[in-house]
Amino acid sequence: MGENDPPAAEAPFSFRSLFGLDDLKISPVAPDGDAVAAQILSLLPLKFFPIIVIGIIALILALAIGLGIHFDCSGKYRCHSSFKCIELTARCDGVSDCKNAEDEYRCVRVSGQRAALQVFTAAAWRTMCSDDWKSHYAKIACAQLGFPSYVSSDHLRVDALEEQFQGDFVSINHLLSDDKVTALHHSVYMREGCTSGHVVTLKCSACGTRTGYSPRIVGGNMSSLTQWPWQVSLQFQGYHLCGGSIITPLWIVTAAHCVYDLYHPKSWTVQVGLVSLMDSPVPSHLVEKIIYHSKYKPKRLGNDIALMKLSEPLTFDETIQPICLPNSEENFPDGKLCWTSGWGATEDGGDASPVLNHAAVPLISNKICNHRDVYGGIISPSMLCAGYLKGGVDSCQGDSGGPLVCQERRLWKLVGATSFGIGCAEVNKPGVYTRITSFLDWIHEQLERDLKT
């Protein structure tokens, strides 16, 4: 076929063509039953018809059974890049079993309210004892989370941990020389308990602090310059399109729907350390690459998360600071008062705000948010709702991708990224956010992969 030839179109499958019925020439005058039977018999002997039908049913059943076995990964790990299932013991074992070696990433995490260090080994997450722990191991752990440096590691009594982190333990193998410890999950042995009675806590980033006052936004208030120092404006071809949150000097978290089909990095710039979008003296930062979640589909709402990597690292000051990511399995209770911010419209259908606004919004349980009078069952576990069922305060158009933050132990944490809603500040239609704890593995994998390149 030449370059100018039209592409060949495949004929659509139909059961009529399978049985040869499309070849029948039906007269506009209804024929008698014997005539139709004669025509069918001339094309397909009736004695073969039951055999073919049974064969098709058997094929469908075989496929269904095969797919059922194929998709059933109970007690196993499913490779995200394919439908392959591997044993849990094969994850983080030093051998790549999945495409792109995904089973050898996300082998370290920081968990719970107290940031306990855990590694995945021998088919389970296990908490790191402080026995034989050395401070330089913390840098290795943070690198496995995608951070190029670390702030501190400390010791915490085992009984101060949440119960789910007190069952399985590991310690660094003290027989290994320091130069042999290159990945924590390859350098540990299992323990029933910690001899020291303490576990390791880890902090990889100096984040979640600010010097501004803590008291879109429909029903919101204008923000001060240092109040939300992690807030950024994502600008497409020079115009504010979405918000985002700084998590490291190089990385911004935003929503996938902001960048889907607009993922050419050179079309984007990022502005930081500003309140007003008008006559702003702050420089624009170029974007090196954009990654959105591979399972994001525009019409399905879920997996609405993306990362932007800047071409050059940010320099932090009182107006530019990273927000902390939450810890794995860290819970934020329903009703907790959190904050959303952005340059979105201050009324439904209005223009984007020229100044950064913020508003306090309580977290709403998914059970309430899925009520038939609210969102009617479309809110998945990887989403969360925040706002007021009575309306009046909400994120709005232009706030997409921006932060929903909560304060825990004097640190501000990124709990959600603004995703969608119906209208702005309407009754029974609170804002819907991407739940960041559901995507920590994905975020850390992208950061770790990039750090290794």
Swiss-Prot record:
<feature type="disulfide bond">
    <location>
        <begin position="396"/>
        <end position="424"/>
    </location>
</feature>
<dbReference type="GO" id="GO:0005783">
    <property type="term" value="C:endoplasmic reticulum"/>
</dbReference>
<feature type="domain" description="Peptidase S1">
    <location>
        <begin position="217"/>
        <end position="448"/>
    </location>
</feature>
<dbReference type="InterPro" id="IPR001190">
    <property type="entry name" value="SRCR"/>
</dbReference>
<dbReference type="InterPro" id="IPR033116">
    <property type="entry name" value="TRYPSIN_SER"/>
</dbReference>
<keyword id="KW-0256">Endoplasmic reticulum</keyword>
<feature type="domain" description="SRCR">
    <location>
        <begin position="104"/>
        <end position="205"/>
    </location>
</feature>
<feature type="disulfide bond">
    <location>
        <begin position="92"/>
        <end position="107"/>
    </location>
</feature>
<keyword id="KW-0325">Glycoprotein</keyword>
<dbReference type="GO" id="GO:0017080">
    <property type="term" value="F:sodium channel regulator activity"/>
</dbReference>
<feature type="active site" description="Charge relay system">
    <location>
        <position position="257"/>
    </location>
</feature>
<dbReference type="InterPro" id="IPR009003">
    <property type="entry name" value="Peptidase_S1_PA"/>
</dbReference>
<feature type="disulfide bond">
    <location>
        <begin position="73"/>
        <end position="85"/>
    </location>
</feature>
<dbReference type="GO" id="GO:0005789">
    <property type="term" value="C:endoplasmic reticulum membrane"/>
</dbReference>
<dbReference type="GO" id="GO:0043025">
    <property type="term" value="C:neuronal cell body"/>
</dbReference>
<feature type="active site" description="Charge relay system">
    <location>
        <position position="304"/>
    </location>
</feature>
<keyword id="KW-1133">Transmembrane helix</keyword>
<protein>
    <recommendedName>
        <fullName>Transmembrane protease serine 3</fullName>
        <ecNumber>3.4.21.-</ecNumber>
    </recommendedName>
</protein>
<comment type="similarity">
    <text>Belongs to the peptidase S1 family.</text>
</comment>
<keyword id="KW-0645">Protease</keyword>
<dbReference type="GO" id="GO:0006508">
    <property type="term" value="P:proteolysis"/>
</dbReference>
<dbReference type="Pfam" id="PF00089">
    <property type="entry name" value="Trypsin"/>
</dbReference>
<dbReference type="InterPro" id="IPR023415">
    <property type="entry name" value="LDLR_class-A_CS"/>
</dbReference>
<feature type="topological domain" description="Extracellular">
    <location>
        <begin position="70"/>
        <end position="453"/>
    </location>
</feature>
<dbReference type="InterPro" id="IPR002172">
    <property type="entry name" value="LDrepeatLR_classA_rpt"/>
</dbReference>
<feature type="active site" description="Charge relay system">
    <location>
        <position position="400"/>
    </location>
</feature>
<feature type="disulfide bond">
    <location>
        <begin position="338"/>
        <end position="406"/>
    </location>
</feature>
<dbReference type="GO" id="GO:0006883">
    <property type="term" value="P:intracellular sodium ion homeostasis"/>
</dbReference>
<feature type="topological domain" description="Cytoplasmic">
    <location>
        <begin position="1"/>
        <end position="48"/>
    </location>
</feature>
<dbReference type="InterPro" id="IPR018114">
    <property type="entry name" value="TRYPSIN_HIS"/>
</dbReference>
<feature type="site" description="Cleavage">
    <location>
        <begin position="216"/>
        <end position="217"/>
    </location>
</feature>
<feature type="domain" description="LDL-receptor class A">
    <location>
        <begin position="72"/>
        <end position="108"/>
    </location>
</feature>
<feature type="disulfide bond">
    <location>
        <begin position="129"/>
        <end position="194"/>
    </location>
</feature>
<feature type="disulfide bond">
    <location>
        <begin position="242"/>
        <end position="258"/>
    </location>
</feature>
<keyword id="KW-0472">Membrane</keyword>
<dbReference type="InterPro" id="IPR001314">
    <property type="entry name" value="Peptidase_S1A"/>
</dbReference>
<dbReference type="InterPro" id="IPR043504">
    <property type="entry name" value="Peptidase_S1_PA_chymotrypsin"/>
</dbReference>
<keyword id="KW-1015">Disulfide bond</keyword>
<dbReference type="InterPro" id="IPR001254">
    <property type="entry name" value="Trypsin_dom"/>
</dbReference>
<keyword id="KW-0720">Serine protease</keyword>
<feature type="glycosylation site" description="N-linked (GlcNAc...) asparagine">
    <location>
        <position position="221"/>
    </location>
</feature>
<keyword id="KW-0378">Hydrolase</keyword>
